Structures are given as C-alpha cells and as structure tokens.
Amino acid sequence: MFMLPILAGNVFQQLYSAVDTIIVGRTLGSDALASVGSIGSLQFLVFGFCSGLAGGVTVVTSQFIGAGKTENARRSTAVIYMIWAVVSLLCTVVGIVCLPGLLHILNMPENLFQRAYAYQLVCFIGLGGQLLYNVESSLLRAIGNSKVPLIFLIISSVLNIILDFVFILVFHMDVVGAAAATILAQSLSGVGCLIYSFRKYPQLRVRKEDFKISFAFLADHLRVGLPLSIQDSITGVGMMVFQSALNGMGADAIAAYTACSKLETFVEMPMYSIAVAMVTFTAQNFGAKQYQRIRKGMKVSLLSCLFFSVVVGGLIIVFCKPLVSIFVGSGAAEVIRLSRIYNSIEASCLWCAALLFTYRGAVQGTGNTKIPMMGGFLELLMRVFAALCLSRIWGFPGLAMAYPLAWIFAALLNMWYYRKLDKNDFQCTRTSLI
C-alpha cells in the first residue's frame, strides 16, 4: 500500500513530462522534439547527481526514524537541507558556464543547437526548485507518508499542463515555454511539501540548533549519499556517450529515441516505484532489525515487477506504432520505423530492469550504497560499449542494446550482494549511525 501513492506520483510526474513532449512534437515539429530529446542525458547527469545525493542521505533519516531517534532525525533533515542548498547553487553556476561546451561534447547537430541551449539554460536556472520537490518527497516517504507528495504532484501536474498550453500556444515561447512550465510547476510542488512537512512532523521540523552538526555526522551522511550520487552520475556519463552516438544519427533517430524513452519511462514507473518503496521499507525495518519483513517485502516486490515487465513489455511490442504516433503523428514514417526497432529490443528485456530495480532498492535500504555504485560503473561500461562498438556494427539496433546490457550486468551484481546479505542475516552491513 505504501508503494501505490509513489507509483501514482511517478505516473503523474511522467504524465506532464509526456505532455511536454506531445505538445512540442505536435505543435513545434520533430526538430523541436529532437532538440529537447537530444539533451536528456545531460539533464539526467546533473539532476541525477543532485537528487542521488539528497535521496541517498534520506536513507539515514529513514533508519533514524525506524530506530525511534527523533533528535537525530531532525539533525539528519538539517544535513539534507544544507546539501540541497550547496549542491543546487554549485550545479546551477557550473552548468550555465559549461553548457555550450557540454552541448558540443554531445555532438549536437547544428540545426538543433540553439533550441537545445535555450531549453537546458532554463532547466539549470530552475534546478534548485526542481530538486526541492525531490528532497521533500524523499523526507516525507522516509517518515512513511507517500500520499502527501502525491497530492502536491497531482496539483503540479495539472498546473504544468495548463502552463504548457499557455507558454507554448498562447505566448509562443517555443521550447523555453515547455522548460519554464515544468520548472515552475515542480518548484511550487516542492514548496507545498516543505510547508506541510514542517507543520505536521516534529521529526522533520528543524530548528536553528539542528544545523550545528559535527563533521563526523555530516561525513556519515555523505558516506551513504555520495556513492548513490556517483552511481547516478556514472549512469549519466554513460547516457551522454549514448546520446552523442545517437545525435550523430540525425534528427529522426533522436526523435524516435525521445518518443520511445517516454514510453519506456511510463512502463518502468511501477517497477521504479516498487524499488523506491523498497528503499524506505528496507531502511526502516533494517533500523528496527526486522529482517524477516525485509525478506517478505523483497519476495512480493520482485514477483510483482517480473510479472508486470513481461505483460507490459509484450503490449509495447504489439502496439508500438499507435503509441509512438501519439508523440510524432502517423506521418513520420522513418521515426516510427526506428521506434519499432528500439521498442522491440527494450521491451523484450524489461524483466532485466525489474531485477535491477528491486534488488538495488533493497541493497540501498540497508545503507550500503557502494554496491549500487559499482553497478553504475557496469552500466557505464555497457552503454559505452554499445555506443562505440555495437552502433558501428549494427547501427541504430546496436545502439538500442545499450540499456538491456546495462540492466543485465548491474542486476547480477546487486543480486549477488543481496543474497550474501540474506545468507548472513543482514549483518554484513550496518551504518555506524544506528
């Protein structure tokens, strides 16, 4: 039941992202769609680093809450706010300064450069607001409340859709309007969660003295958070190599990937939501030393993810053309052809993603983030291999194998470590904070 609001929230979050894509693709054309899609890996790299760090340290907060240590939970929350402020500022400044060079690294086609630059510039400017929602929703989930983030996200989703139409169709702001709509909607959602959490939960109601923390306390949080941040950054680097190879294949290939990635994200949402729930569920029960509950939760989560991946993967393969046509229209024949190739490969391997998400979530919940980080390295290697080697041999189909290969190898590592933990009654790892 804890997972259901998380799932609904992720669906709504991807819904307004998909609406952005549909409006851009249908009203501004395939070049505009390709411009937005061509920087997806850069957005993941930056946002993944920031949200991975913030999300990682909330694992510690969850363990404090599970252990009933309210004062430490408040101090942990203060650490999260400090990290959010510093990281948001640094990434915004560095991102804006380095943006032209980053787009050149991505092998950005000349006809897409200006739109891609304008879109990403707005995203960098509003990065702090975007991250605020992720931080607050993670804190609320850490305390066991996954419904309130959903409520604010629904409001944000509706607002985002309205602003999309206003900024793009009324004010003719082009792709900048799509970026501004998303930034504004997510920022308001984050502020709403912040106000609610401060008023409702004493464990999250930080005081001035809570910010007076020792270096050791901060270091213990970073020990958990940094590997997750590095893991997402490594994944982002692999995606940038993938994106660079993709951008060299032209606007049709970029548009096909952009449309397919939106579908893929929707399909992965239930599995990802279960994984997010497993992190909190495992962390709280790990803090309370309820290891048998972790095992039961893992079994239910894994079976649910595998069943979903097989059923929905088959549906994606069968209904690929009408689904992709939602984003680009039925007249984009080459985009649809490439989308069929991509979806056939990805959808048939979704069960690998199910294994990865579930096992990785459980491992992260125990406070061990080094294994998921090592899995991130494996994902990087596989994406680079597909981008630099397989794409040269088989073209677009070879490039499409990047994600399945990444899922398989990272899943094997996390599976091995979880079974090691299970065999030793979860005594292989215990954070020094609990």
State what each model feature region is.
Residues 15-34, 103-110, 166-175, 233-262, ...:
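Helix-terminus/linker motif at the lipid-water interface of multi-pass membrane proteins
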Residues 1-3, 61-128, 170-226, 282-349, ...:
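Short alpha-helical transmembrane segments in multi-pass integral membrane proteins
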Residues 54, 122-141, 149-157, 178-193, ...:
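Short runs within selected transmembrane alpha-helices of multi-pass transporters and secretion channels
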Residues 45, 160-165, 190-194, 266-269, ...:
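Hydrophobic transmembrane alpha-helices of multi-pass small-molecule transporters
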Residues 1-20, 122, 133, 156, ...:
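Transmembrane helical elements of multi-pass membrane transporters/channels
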Residues 2-28, 41-56, 60, 85-92, ...:
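N-terminal transmembrane alpha-helices
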Residues 33-93, 130-149, 256-320, 353-375:
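Small-residue-rich hydrophobic transmembrane alpha-helices
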